[in-house]
Design a protein with these regions (language model features):
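Residues lining hydrophobic/aromatic ligand-binding pockets adjacent to catalytic sites
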Residues: 1-145
Length: 145
């Protein structure tokens, strides 16, 4: 599994407290710091929990401006382009890590599952509507994959 961030703002630990283009292999052998800009929300729609103008007004995703704009962004590039991008990132990581097993792209969204203001639901919707099964990672990982 290759973790790939979709976040506008990654947590600092994801880049070992260095720049956003820094990636590294942690003590568990997991590569951290990989990103795909095809999935990163545009910064002009950065609303976050504290900045959300719709907080407590909008309780469903279809009426949230951020979610609508993010869904439009995903639809502005082809599914094939996204699959190719994820494949390229995984192939590079696979070579760097030196494993021969098939790599699986795991899109990382840093909000908790319960947070309705999260790209995770829009990413899942986009892939599922385009015939690609996309669901939440099941834990514990070792027992499920």
């Amino acid at each position: 599994m290759i973790p790939i961030s979709t976040a506008m703002w990654d947590p600092k630990w994801f880049h070992d407290f260095k720049s956003n283009d820094f990636n590294f292999i942690d003590k568990n052998g997991v590569i951290n710091g990989l990103r795909s800009e095809l999935f990163v929300p545009d910064k002009q729609y950065d609303c976050g929990t504290d900045l959300c103008k719709e907080k407590d007004k909008v309780t469903d995703i279809p009426n949230c401006k951020f979610m609508n704009e993010y869904y439009s962004k995903l639809n502005s590039t082809t599914l094939e382009g996204k699959i190719n991008e994820l494949g390229r990132i995984c192939k590079n990581a696979q070579g760097r890590l030196g494993f021969k097993e098939e790599s699986i792209a795991v899109l990382i969204v840093f909000e908790v599952v319960e947070n309705m203001c999260s790209e995770r639901q829009i990413i899942q919707k986009y892939f599922n509507e385009n015939g690609v099964d996309c669901k939440e990672l099941a834990y514990p990982i070792k027992e499920n994959y």
